[in-house]
Every structure is written in C-alpha cells, then in structure tokens.
C-alpha cells in the first residue's frame, strides 16, 4: 500500500473486485444480520484464457441458477474522468492463429530466389482479410448478423461521450481511425465488429542482422463480435474465405471463441445497479472525498468493448447481466507489474454492492 493505492498483480482485474463482493456480504451480515436477497457466487479462474470449461459448468449446473434476477459480473471501475460506469453487455471474440510453412528448416536467405518464403505467403493471406483503408473486413458474410442498436442504446452513447482527447493522449496517437469523433466514434467502438492482427512472428527478429529465410510464419487474428454474430460461424467464414482465395495451404487454429452478449439497459437489474451507484458515489461527494465524482454522472452504457463469457448466463440461462460495480480506474495498469487500485475506490465498491443488495431485496 503506497500513497493511497494498493499495488498487486490482479488487484484491479480482478481479485479486488472479487473481494469487494465477498466483503459486501460480510458487511451486511455483521451490520444487519440476514441478507436482503438470496445470493449465489460462481468463481471461475480461467477467464484470461477464454473460460474453456465454463460452458460445461453452466450446462451441468444451470438449473440451479435459473430464476435469479440476474448476474453481477466481475469487472468494474471508473473512466479517465473519475466517473463510475455500468455496462450491460460485452463483445464476443473469435481468436485464430494462421500458420504458413515452407522448408523443413530455416535456411540461408540467398536461397530466396528459388525457395518460397512463408512470411510473404502469410502477408498475402492477411491482406486478403481486410480493406485497411476502409477499415472493413473482407470475409464474405462477416457483417450479415450484425444487429443495429436500438434508440435507447444510441441515446446512452449520446449522453455519455468518450473522453477522446484523454484517450488519444494516453495512447500517444494523433487521431482515431478515419478521424472519427463524437457519436460516430462511440458507435464504432461498441456497435461494430473488428478484425485485428494481434501479432506476427517469423524468422529472425533480434538485434543486428541474420540472413535467414524462415521455415514458418504465424499470425494471431482477433475478431471482436457484436450481437447477433456467433464466434464459431465467424471462424467458419474465415476458413472458407481463405480456401476460396487460394490459401488452402494456410493452417488455421481457433484459440478462443466467445459469443457477444447484450442485456437490456432498461431492465430491473441495470436500473438497480444504476440507482445504487448514484447513491454510493453521491455520498462520496457529500463527504468531500478526493476520489468522488458527482453521483448523477454515473455512466450507463449498452456494452463494453472487451469480452467475457457473459453469453453463457444471458443467452443460455436467460439471466440479465451487468458489470461495473468494481474498484478499477483508468490508471490501474491492468496486467502490468504496477497494477493498482485506490483504497478509497475499493471501499466505495464494497459500499456499492451493499446498496445493490438493498435495492434488490
């Protein structure tokens, strides 16, 4: 603990948020006795690798969860302006690895005149996937299932604009793609799918020179999906795209496949989460907290741009889901060695869960 912050790996994503839920229950039991509502906890430790066993769990134990008001998800925090946020959904993901092979070993680059280079072959395959200038995926049928946002969802984006200048400054970029801003920028971020190269590996990448013709080239591709796209369908479409364009030799392995999820922003759980957030952070303002922000400025957004297995609970079990009741913040440095949360934010998150239990009781 240093300068009002707790530093620890996973403290923001997401061990701290897990403990806020447990300590909120502890606070209620110690202060009032019996809980105002029934609670069930699902602890799952594989989210960072795509939750490969969670579907098996929900199929086996889903009947025990059905009938609940909904699911309070694991994440949450404040934006760069210090505003708490409530989100009712996530994007999905189709993550694949493409592999091109040539010789059975790395060989001297002088042989490039007569030996095919898998790195160039991979570049050609990648180029076929996307029109970079238009920022549009070229896989046939990629956008077919994209569901347009409703009027309420669009209104929420209009009411809660992104902190564009802070985002650009923080990332060190002069402008967003196509110089987007305002509602167009927020809509692109949350309502449109993506097709992104996450990494490319081949040959020699160390210091200085090494004249090598690589035997293999690999690329990892990440497609973030929106309702009503399906991850397995997108994977099939990518494979078909490669085959139809003469890249049958390019191997493809699906590394992660999760569907998007969207709960109603005007549902009972979302509104209870919003009301309890406004009350909690409004109290911080009244108390003169240095970490407070006006309670009425709590952001309610349709979904986040990230991914989690929320669809297993919403689409398959019929449970509304919300996230946002957490202790994170814009400078938490998630996944970095100096990951941190503010002590005051941590206890505010505990208080938020306590109030939410009261709202649902």
Language-model segment annotations:
Residues 5, 39-51, 74-79, 102-105, ...:
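Acidic, glycine-rich active-site loops and adjacent beta-strand->loop/helix elements
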């Amino acid at each position: 603990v240093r300068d009002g912050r707790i530093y620890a790996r996973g403290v923001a994503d997401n061990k701290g948020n897990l403990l806020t839920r447990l300590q909120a229950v502890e606070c209620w039991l110690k202060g009032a006795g019996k809980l105002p509502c029934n609670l069930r906890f699902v602890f799952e430790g594989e989210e960072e690798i795509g939750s490969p066993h969670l579907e098996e769990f929900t199929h086996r134990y889903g009947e025990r969860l059905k009938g609940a008001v909904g699911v309070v998800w694991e994440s949450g925090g404040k934006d760069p302006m210090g505003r708490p946020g409530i989100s009712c959904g996530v994007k999905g993901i189709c993550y694949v690895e493409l592999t091109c092979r040539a010789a059975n070993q790395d060989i001297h680059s002088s042989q490039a005149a007569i030996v095919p280079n898998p790195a160039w072959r991979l570049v050609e395959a990648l180029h076929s996937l996307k029109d970079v200038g238009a920022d549009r995926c070229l896989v046939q049928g990629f956008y077919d299932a994209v569901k347009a946002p409703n009027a309420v969802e669009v209104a929420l984006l209009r009411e809660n604009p992104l902190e564009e200048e802070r985002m650009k400054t923080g990332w060190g970029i002069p402008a967003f793609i196509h110089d987007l801003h305002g509602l167009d920028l927020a809509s692109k971020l949350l309502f449109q799918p993506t097709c992104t190269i996450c990494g490319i590996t081949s040959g020699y990448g160390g210091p200085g020179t090494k004249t090598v013709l690589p035997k293999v080239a690999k690329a990892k591709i990440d497609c973030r999906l929106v309702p009503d796209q399906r991850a397995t369908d997108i994977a099939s479409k990518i494979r078909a795209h490669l085959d139809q364009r003469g890249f049958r030799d390019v191997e493809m392995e699906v590394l992660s496949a999760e569907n998007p999820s969207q709960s109603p922003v005007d549902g009972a759980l979302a509104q209870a989460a919003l009301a309890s957030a406004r009350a909690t952070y409004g109290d911080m303002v009244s108390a003169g907290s240095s970490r407070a922000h006006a309670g009425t400025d709590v952001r309610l957004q349709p979904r986040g741009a990230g991914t989690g297995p929320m669809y297993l609970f919403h689409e398959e079990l019929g449970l509304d889901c919300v996230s946002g009741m957490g202790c994170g913040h814009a400078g938490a440095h998630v996944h970095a060695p100096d990951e941190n949360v503010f002590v005051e934010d941590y206890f505010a998150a505990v208080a938020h869960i306590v109030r939410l239990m009261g709202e649902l009781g």
